[in-house]
Amino acid sequence: MSSTDPLLRRVENYRESCDNCAKSKVRCGKEQPWCQRCERRGQVCSYSPSQRSRKRTLDAAHPESDQRNGTPPFTAISSASSVAAVSTGFSSMLSQADSWGTCPDLVELLTSGSSSESLTPDNNHLVWLSDMESIAGDSNISKSMERMDVFPYPKSIASSAAGVVNGSGAGADSMGRRSTCPLQNKQHCEADLISALAKPELPSLSCWGNPKASQNLGTILTASRATLKCVTTAMSCTCTPNDNVALLATAVLLRILSWYHIVLKNCNGPNDTSAATIDDHTSPTPSNDGKDTERSVSRDTNVSQDGSEPSSLIMPPMTIGAYELDSENRERMIGHIMLSELGKMGNLLSDFSKKFCDPQSTMLGNDNRSQLFLALEMLIRNKHMATVLDVRKKLEVK
């Protein structure tokens, strides 16, 4: 065989636009061999031969070879070096964060100095309506099923897709309806978590120290419940796990734990000697005619042992009908409420582990990304367990 044999350098003509973009009649990113649109939608990006485009070798033209070799097609979203840097940072964070006083404020890093525009997800990564309308009509479902096996889709969706591939047609309708759900919710998860961090009406408490102004206990408990519900919705979503959702969920959970920590610093347990003093400040003063005067919320101020500035927490009175709880019963009630919410957070951490740390659900077995997810889970679990122990210590009865 001569050196000029065309088989030695087999070159074919491929179109500049991938098959999915050409079929949907949208502009292709031309980031060959993987276009950004196909990466965002989780589709197999392929280029059919065409006589009206430039030449590319077969190795660059077929992304399936990269997938077989284990190369993840997610370099457009986050490179391996950036993920490794974040993973290394969180590993050092776990070794240094022995107490809440040394806890790096991940919330401040994400939200400080950012305008509302910067908190909005990048438009380049949004799933547009024109892309959504063409999902159900995309062909080559068998190749999509190969990628579907990598991610944790519900069994109902997987069985419906299998019915389409086998030609049964039983799951065709349900597959067409449900296929848009993960793609729609992928960006909604990030937007909801960012919104939960950026809401101005939420308590501005930080795990670095004390709040700048007094906070209302009712506002803290209400905000923690709503924020925890937002994270629960994100964890139950069937979208593909990604770094952004994991980091945002970690920031939200750390903020909730910081709220509970401030409440614990301002609440005295049933064994504290200062409980009677706080009860004197918080109990309503009866009027001369025997009726309770208008209840004004009181402010409990505790000075931390390390000499830092005092933190204030507004403790509204708690009543059961005409009966008002005294200081000891009120703070015991607060402790049980916090334990109940922390129990929900414990179940949420199990969902976080299944979504991000399970070997079968981690993105294509990327080691750097797996280390990042494990570091985030360890950080949240350590802070969660420390908070649970503090609450139980407050509720101990000698």
Swiss-Prot record:
InterPro entries, per the entry: AflR, Zn2-C6_fun-type_DNA-bd_sf, Zn2Cys6_DnaBD
A GO MF term: DNA binding
Keywords tagged on the record: DNA-binding, Metal-binding, Nucleus, Transcription, Transcription regulation, Zinc
GO BP term, example: aflatoxin biosynthetic process
Subcellular location: Nucleus
SMART domains according to UniProt: GAL4 (SM00066)
DNA-binding region of this protein: 18-45
Isomerase among keywords: no
Start and end residues of each stretch annotated as Disordered: 52-73, 275-314
Principal location class: nucleus
Summary of the knockout phenotype: Leads to an albinos phenotype. Inactivates the expression of the aurofusarin biosynthetic gene cluster.
Domain of life: Eukaryota
GO cellular component, as recorded: nucleus
Biased composition (Polar residues): 299-311
Induction per the UniProt record: Expression correlates with aurofusarin production and is restricted to vegetative mycelia. Expression is negatively regulated by the MAPK-mediated osmotic stress-signaling pathway.
PROSITE patterns: ZN2_CY6_FUNGAL_1, ZN2_CY6_FUNGAL_2
Compositionally biased tracts (Basic and acidic residues): 56-67, 289-298
Pfam families: AflR, Zn_clus
Job of this protein: Transcription factor that specifically regulates the expression of the gene cluster that mediates the biosynthesis of aurofusarin, a red mycelium pigment which is acting as a mycotoxin.
Protein name: Aurofusarin biosynthesis regulatory protein aurR1
